[in-house]
Amino acid sequence: VFGGEPGSRLVDLLAKGAEDQQDVTDRLGYQVRRAVEELVGAFERLDRDSHRELLKGVGETEVYEGVLTVMMRLVFLFCAEERGLLHLGEDLYDRFYAVSTLREQLHDDASKLTEEVLDRRSSAWCRLLATFRMVYQGVAHEDLRIPAYGGTLFDPDRFPWLEGRQADGTNEPPHISDRIVLHLLDSLQVLRQGQEARKLSFHALDVEQIGHVYEGLLDHTAKRALKPILGLVGKEGDEPEVDLETLESKVAEGRDKFIAYLKDQTGKTERALGNLLDQATDAEKLRKLRVVCGDDHDLFERVKPFANLIREDSFGN
């Protein structure tokens, strides 16, 4: 990962011409969309574990809007910190509040402890919540003074469930893992194209360019699946999601028709799809599949025949 060099700034990348600009915006849009999916999924799992109390009364559209608001808050903070509008560079702010330094801190922890350990911690999410509150309400402390900026973007009462606040007075921050926060920050700070990873700077990025990068996110929303849905391999940014019952019905029509259906859905060749169906599923992939299926053995057995067709998330699961 390269940072701070000429050409690494997002504004420089966007200035390279219409074709390059489209490549950058498409790639960033894809990265951020995957991160949004992860955070939406995390809140869904926490809501399920809380017996539907965490998101009680919260509609699907509001969940998506709340998660998208988190991403836009992060973009705002990156821009503000890099323009010197906050206290980036001061020890107290850098260690406990800055979003620009948080990613490296989490990467250091992951290197020392492994990313899996980050799954069991949620201090980074609490730090983000504190920073969001700080920007909205301000801070008056002898070692750190920040005016209250207010505004709707950082208003904590727009999406109180982001903080774990519920109508009954419950106020416990949701356990969004440090690993997920790391992936959120990575999606915004690092442009990944093939084997190249380029650290981005938001310095001098104007509102129009931010809107150009993220406008595609407004075309999406979140829907709660009422039956098992499998995310299949496919063209990046256009990977299909198909319900398990449909896949099972297509298999029943015969191998040739099933492969033809998969070709239409994934864009892969019939030969490549045939190879995926024929190759043995390795033990590690089956282990991950069992984890995803939880205690539902019947679901695991139903999904198992399609294991090699399922795409991995950004965690490699």
Question: Each PLM stretch: what is its role?
Answer:
Residues 1-317:
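Charged, often flexible domain-edge or linker segments that flank or initiate folded functional domains
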